[in-house]
């Protein structure tokens, strides 16, 4: 039963407002003693020509109270107190019946949503900054899918640009074939950094890099073969990371994919009469929108990444007919996307308003800079492995007899990192703190995973007791039991709000709420040793439902649960 909808229906019987509008006005009171749902009567004052306080008092008298413990007025608010036993039984039954689908819906049915995320640069390391976009995008994909949308995952690889000319030059001068086969990204990074170091004293190297990129653009056999090799070796390394994270994509079409699609974009902009020549370059002037010009073709005739993004957006709309196209890219690109979207709009594309850039913050880690050019980079693979190693040490210390130690260490270690990325608003910067991140207390991934494992441990012990009594839900009368059941009800609301805000942290924080409510309940009430068998069975059903909800919430943010810890 959807209690919020029930509240709206009961109010609708007495007021002239649309059901949907009533539902939107319903609030959750800040304190339990003020009820479980509250309806502010201010909006009715004008229509009913009465003070909100009087309206609330009248409605409290008239309203059908079936399914509610009581309905009271408090000033201008109409407060609903649900029947706690009926509510808890209803939620527990719903969770256990729907299982892995609990919290899902079909609200997005028939809607295509493109999600572009991860998008690492070929021949460069997958560093800790790349995980931010990957974690957010993968979580949004799961959330959208869960609520019935058709999400399309795109990895817009950085596989084109003048840097590939520099890389070809560097490889031909200093490349080590053996090192390239053994550790491709490390070797490509080494020669890339060397190129920049040498170019500081020998500017002619930059010309050589441009020359090799021109060869690549012109389809020179050797240049294309080297570029393809660098790309294949890089993807092989990237896939190791994606496998660790459980991430996949529907399309790997990178920047190079749009090379033959950019002329058409330029033609369309010329046809729309918005392309202007400026210092030899072709640009779209955006002064009246308080933005610098969007450069589409450089003065030397070369394309720029804005050109490729314009081509990519057009291609995606034609291919996927999207209702929304989401770009999960750092906040340093806000201006770039504003220029691209405005250019698409000025070219007469109505769908441009459905293109959304969702920016995210920076990743800070022990004063180390994330600069690929200087080679000073915190590699993501190293970070993930370090998290697994540290978790393994904790397991060895706390539970050396645990089975599947390696699998558990991997799930907790990687889960801890993902949780850290997705715990707060995505635009906030992340500062890594191993001690806090891997702690089993506080608002962390291990704390939520431990809560799940604790619930499963209780259920395994209960199985050994061979309990045959039917659950007596009328005995679930304590404050902690009701608060836990109430928290379990909120999964779908959290997911839908997370989708509306394009903010996975809503679901992450919800998982913390469930874990806290569960631990508060368990710390205040005995379960396995309670004498009343009906109450024991009811509490076990509540625990079973809690484990299911934690599992579903963690799945949505890309984290696996562990059965034992």
UniProtKB/Swiss-Prot annotation:
Localization of this protein: Cytoplasm
Keyword Plastid found: no
InterPro entries with a match to the protein in the record: aa-tRNA-synth_I_CS, Arg-tRNA-ligase, Arg-tRNA-synth_N, Arg-tRNA-synth_N_sf, ArgRS_core, DALR_anticod-bd, Rossmann-like_a/b/a_fold, tRNAsynth_Ia_anticodon-bd
GO cellular component: a single term: cytoplasm
Motif ('HIGH' region): 120-130
GO molecular function: arginine-tRNA ligase activity; ATP binding
Major location (coarse): cytoplasm
Protein name: Arginine--tRNA ligase
Gene responsible for this protein: argS
């Amino acid at each position: 039963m959807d209690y919020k909808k029930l509240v709206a229906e009961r109010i609708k019987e007495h007021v002239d407002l649309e059901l949907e509008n009533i539902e939107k006005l319903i609030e959750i009171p800040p304190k339990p003693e003020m009820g479980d749902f509250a309806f502010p009567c201010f909006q009715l004052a004008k229509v009913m020509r009465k003070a909100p306080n009087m309206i609330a008092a009248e409605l409290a008298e008239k309203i059908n109270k079936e399914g509610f413990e009581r309905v009271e007025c408090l000033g201008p608010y109409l407060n609903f107190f649900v029947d706690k036993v009926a509510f808890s039984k209803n939620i527990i039954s719903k969770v256990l019946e729907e299982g892995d689908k609990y919290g899902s819906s079909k609200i997005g049915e028939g809607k295509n949503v493109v999600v572009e995320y991860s998008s690492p640069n070929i021949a460069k390391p997958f560093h800790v900054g790349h995980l931010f976009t990957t974690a957010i995008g993968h979580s949004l994909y799961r959330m959208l899918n869960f609520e019935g949308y058709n999400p399309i995952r795109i990895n817009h690889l950085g596989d084109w640009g003048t840097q590939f000319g520099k890389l070809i030059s560097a490889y031909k001068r200093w490349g080590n074939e053996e090192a390239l086969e053994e550790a491709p990204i490390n070797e490509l990074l080494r020669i890339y950094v060397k190129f920049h170091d040498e170019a500081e004293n020998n500017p002619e190297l930059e010309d050589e890099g441009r020359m090799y990129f021109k060869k690549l653009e012109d389809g020179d056999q050797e240049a294309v073969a080297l570029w393809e090799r660098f790309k294949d070796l890089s993807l092989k390394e990237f896939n190791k990371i994606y496998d660790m994270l459980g991430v996949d994509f529907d399309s790997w079409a990178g920047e190079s994919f749009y090379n033959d699609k950019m002329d058409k974009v330029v033609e369309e902009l010329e046809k729309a009469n918005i392309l202007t020549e400026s210092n030899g370059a072709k640009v779209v002037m955006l002064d009246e929108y308080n933005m610098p010009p969007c450069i589409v073709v450089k003065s030397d005739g070369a394309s720029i990444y804005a050109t490729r993004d314009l081509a990519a957006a057009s291609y995606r709309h034609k291919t996927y007919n999207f209702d929304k196209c989401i770009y999960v890219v750092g906040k340093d690109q806000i201006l770039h996307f504003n220029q691209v979207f405005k250019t698409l709009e000025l070219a007469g594309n109505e769908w441009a308003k459905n293109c959304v850039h969702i920016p995210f913050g920076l990743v800070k880690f022990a004063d180390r800079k994330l600069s690929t050019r200087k080679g000073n980079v915190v590699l993501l693979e190293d970070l993930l492995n370090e998290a697994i190693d540290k978790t393994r040490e904790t397991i060895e210390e706390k539970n050396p007899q645990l089975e599947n130690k390696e699998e558990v260490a991997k799930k907790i270690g990687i889960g801890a990192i993902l949780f850290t990325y997705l715990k707060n608003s995505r635009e906030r910067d992340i500062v890594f703190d191993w001690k806090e991140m891997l702690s089993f207390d506080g608002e962390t991934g291990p704390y939520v995973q431990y809560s799940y494992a604790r619930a499963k441990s209780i259920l395994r012990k209960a199985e050994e007791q061979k309990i045959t009594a039917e659950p007596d839900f009328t005995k679930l009368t304590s404050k902690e039991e009701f608060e836990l059941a109430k928290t379990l009800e909120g999964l779908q609301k959290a997911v839908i709000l997370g989708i509306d805000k394009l903010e996975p942290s809503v679901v992450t924080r919800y998982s913390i709420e469930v874990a806290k409510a569960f631990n508060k309940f368990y710390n205040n009430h005995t379960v396995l040793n309670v004498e009343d068998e009906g109450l024991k069975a009811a509490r076990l059903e509540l625990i079973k439902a809690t484990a299911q909800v934690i599992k579903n919430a963690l799945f949505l943010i890309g984290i696996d649960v562990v059965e034992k810890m």
